[in-house]
Amino acid sequence: MARYTGPTCKLARREGADLFLKSGIRSLDSKCKVTQLPGMHGASARRQKGTEYGLQLREKQKIRRIYGILEKQFRLYYKKASQKKGSTGENLLSLLECRLDNVVYRMGFASTRAEARQLVSHKSIMVNGLVVNIPSYQVSVNDKISIREKAKKQSRIQLALELSGQSTQPQWLDVDNKTLKGVFKNVPSRDELPSDIQEHLIVELYSK
């Protein structure tokens, strides 16, 4: 299955939630009506109350799209999360948050996770002084993330830094915007992550 490259607004409207797929402080512009279903009759169509299974499936799709994960890879993350001690749902979120592309995005070096994925794939990111071009690379506590010297002047990185400077930096990261370096201080706890994610629905879905 190929990675989705169509309109990001359509995905947000399908899930009825902001998936943070667009750059900027507000990830959706005024043209993207999140509560309106996509399609010709989206404006007049009503979002039906789904079944229990439908709600679980939608939540899984929402989280997959937020982090840009394909179905097969998402299942592998869930399997790994279920094998670890503690809450499977929280373990799953931790694994997703520790992805290198997500950390690059959280540090403000990219405006979106998709953009962060490109930076990693194009060998613009270093971990502990070594180039890493695998977006799914799992970042560990105290790992040092930096932008390669030749990539520092990219306009998209400068724009991302400008935008990130207007928002609150996650407490589990220590970022120096002048040197374009950051430290992954600790794995974020559940209360430090978005509250609108209902990971328990995914656990219920895969537990059947």
Curated annotation (Swiss-Prot):
| Entry's Gene Ontology BP terms | ribosomal small subunit biogenesis; translation
Keywords, A to Z, come to: Ribonucleoprotein, Ribosomal protein, RNA-binding, rRNA-binding
Keyword RNA-binding among record annotations: yes
| NCBIfam families, sorted | PRK05327.1, rpsD_bact
Family in the record: Belongs to the universal ribosomal protein uS4 family.
Question: How is this protein organized at the quaternary level?
Answer: Part of the 30S ribosomal subunit. Contacts protein S5. The interaction surface between S4 and S5 is involved in control of translational fidelity.
Q: What is this protein called?
A: Small ribosomal subunit protein uS4
| Origin species | Vesicomyosocius okutanii subsp. Calyptogena okutanii (strain HA)
Per the UniProt record, the lineage of the source organism begins with: Bacteria, Pseudomonadati, Pseudomonadota, Gammaproteobacteria, Candidatus Pseudothioglobaceae
